[in-house]
Regions:
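N-terminal export signals
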Residues: 5-25
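Cell wall/extracellular polymer interaction/catalysis modules
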Residues: 26-172, 179-188, 193, 202-205
């Protein structure tokens, strides 16, 4: 059976990324949500092209889910695995502070989360300690550098905050994680990989 036959019927087809047989088998035996996430990762890698120089792991932030849910997915295309983390969205995207993202914005000063594909750049030490700069690749997020949109750790993204308030705190538009989960994101995603943000609403059962 051809690899393309294994992927037939997936949500997003024609991603243009050839996968080893062991990965194709792993993807087909995953959950419905994992299969959709792999399709999205391949599609966005293909769309980003040469702007992404490390293509093994893709981060997908699903802001269609409540902030209490692990909605930042590390999609490992080589191992056929998905690891999900908690991530905060921007205050300008959730002015009611109820844990739901209502809107995206690329406007400076909006403090909102931006939709689209990003390339992860170098680490630096800033207000929140080690952080990762992001370059926006779409018209919907191309102000990311000017807006200082980065990946960083934050106390308001810790599990203790979630347990107390039932939702994460909000960032100024950055992708903010708790300490341990930020370390996981940093090690897996920095240095030329793809981060894609959208409102997908993919629940755990697909």
């Amino acid at each position: 059976m051809q690899r393309r036959d294994l992927l037939k019927g997936a949500l997003v087809a024609g991603a243009g990324l050839a996968l080893p047989a062991r990965l194709a088998a792993s993807v087909m035996t995953g959950t419905p949500r994992e299969r959709v996430l792999f399709d999205i990762a391949k599609r966005e890698l293909d769309r980003a092209g040469s702007a992404i120089w490390k293509r093994d792991i893709v981060g997908i932030a699903d802001f269609g889910l409540h902030s209490a849910k692990p909605r930042f997915h590390l999609v490992n295309l080589e191992r056929g695995e998905v690891q999900s983390l908690h991530v905060s969205h921007g205050t300008g995207s959730d002015q009611e502070h109820d844990g739901w993202l209502k809107q995206f914005s690329n406007v400076e000063g909006s403090n909102a989360t931006s939709r689209g594909a990003y390339v992860t750049w170098e680490w630096y030490v800033g207000r929140y300690g080690t952080s990762v700069r992001l370059g926006g690749l779409d018209p919907t997020n191309d102000a990311a550098l000017r807006r200082y949109i980065v990946m960083h750790r934050a106390a308001y993204s810790e599990s203790a905050h979630l347990a107390k308030w039932g939702r994460l705190g909000r960032s100024n538009g950055c992708f903010a994680f708790g300490e341990e989960q930020f370390r996981t994101a940093l090690l897996n995603l920095s240095g030329g990989r793809l981060l894609y943000a959208d409102s997908l609403g993919l629940e755990e059962d697909g």
